[in-house]
Amino acid sequence: LNHPKADLSKGQYGTVGQGLHIAKKLLPFIPANAGILLVPCCRGGSAFTTGADGTYSDASGASENSTRWGVDKPLYKDLIGRTKAALKKNPKNVLFAVVWMQGEFDFGGTPVNHAAQFGALVDKFRAD
């Protein structure tokens, strides 16, 4: 499980994002006949407390200018759409875990606002 452009002699797992590295670390904990399906939904420069909502369409997902996370915002709808599509693709696919990495774009907001908004998003994701 390595990115095709990774130089294994240098200990590289992947060259884009953290997904391949995380998947490689999870492999010892899953059955030998199972696999890991990555559903990337990240958006550079996104945040909960700042940014543009953008738009969403079922055909193309969140628009390029969507940079704000939150319940029912375009990035959230994109997350749900991608996750449901991955689960529907194969009846054996099961949602096992979500890895969330938040960047520094929420630095200007208050921790209380961020925690509340993230908690609401997690609750909604579990319900959807």
Where are these regions (language model features)?
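Cell-envelope and extracellular/periplasmic
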Residues: 1-128
